[in-house]
Amino acid sequence: MGKGSRITAGLLVALGALTFAAVAACAQQRAGQPQGKQGTGKARQGGVLVGQGAMGDWTTDAPGVRRRITTADLPKPYETRSVDQGPRLVPRPEGAWPQVPAGFKVEEFAAGLQRPRLIRTAPNGDLFVAESYSGRVRVLRAGKEPGRAEVNEVFAADLARPFGIAFYPHGPDPQYVYVANTGSVVRFPYRNGDLKARAPAEVVVPDIPGGGQLRGGGHWTRDIAFTRDGRKMFVSVGSLTNVWERPDDKEERRADILEYNPDGTGFRVYAYGIRNAVGIAVHPETGELWASVNERDGLGDDLVPDYITRVREGGFYGWPWYYLGPNQDPRHPGARPDLRDKVIVPDVLIQSHSASLQMEFYTGRQFPQGYAGHAFAAEHGSWNRARRTGYKVIRVPVNRGVPTGEYEDFMTGFVTPAGDVWGRPVGVTVAKDGSLIVTDDGSNSVWRVSYTGK
């Protein structure tokens, strides 16, 4: 490449970076002045976007933007038309890079994966990634430079859409890696540092209801988590349909969180009416189960908000007859009045159709103290919304185990100025060094967010 070409290329990169920086800055400025219908009602309250102003779209996203959505903000069903507008994925443009708050740095930890989905950190620091569509679980390991994977190996293959991953028992020396396939839970014998499964998979739970196509409403992801004492295992199972068509009964063992003993015995339904808890996690201090949930489609742009919530034992969360309390789904008029007053209102409502996926509590020590104990969640992005939302990682403030009810954009920038999408966050995990690791099945990358203070 000649000198002139190098100068031209450099200018293009610089211009691209400036364009994306300008878009991010404008988004932050617009966040207090949403456009169109979003400008109705009170937009801010103490620096937090509220009411219709909190609904917004990707143009109001930027690191540090805070939102609070309540049931009082919900529009009526069908107030806007239900649209089919999935993202048009494009290669990452020159100069495009995820945006994070000041003092943080983003590095591409690994590239070229096959649609990386959920990710979890092993006690020794290895990162286990589900490549669900390829039927694999992969192991990534940093080298001397923490910002780049030096080891990239397939731990197990020929699995059936693996998603959830968990190490058992808790502590520095687990004996098993559990993997949740779409129709079963299996486990592999494991010792710290294993890059390959040392034995074939042992089936622990053989009969989880599986199948379904996500776009058509059927949900195939299964996450798993263990109680703090290791005596129980939770498995999340999404609904088979987007809107259940039978008025009085519900799909068997779907739209539930199931509970088992670690050996697969002792089955019971822990909580129900949770349409699709893609991500679950146990709070490290309180021991409470939390879930990151995708709500239903077809009722308009701002119905029904996704949510992140503590999950109450025996609790009913509404699906398919109600949503977010005693709000009846109009597609099930008059159905199940006996359950109306039992519906639990979730803790934190997220912009509708954001597709909230994996969640994780921050237990590291690298980030500033104000992040300790807060939750992070990956928002994969909308398809059933005229104005795109999601395509980001959010932070959910937690005070002594109790969510405050608001959330904050933490990692944005995955949408181009033209509205095309180049990245879709799926998984989040806290690395052993305290950095935050994010999987992105839009660009097939794994990102590392570290705090530098600069």
Locate the predicted segments by residue.
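Bacterial N-terminal signal peptides
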Residues: 10-22
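Beta-propeller domain segments
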Residues: 42-101, 174, 186, 221, ...
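Beta-propeller domains
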Residues: 97-98, 124-149, 193
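Surface loop/turn motifs at the tips and blade-to-blade linkers of beta-strand repeat domains
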Residues: 108-113, 154-160, 204-209, 213-216, ...
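Hydrophobic beta-strand segments that make up the repeating blades of beta-propeller
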Residues: 127-129, 175-179, 232-235, 289-291, ...
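Asp-box/WD-like beta-propeller blade repeats and closely related beta-sheet repeat scaffolds
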Residues: 150-152, 156-168, 175, 181-229, ...
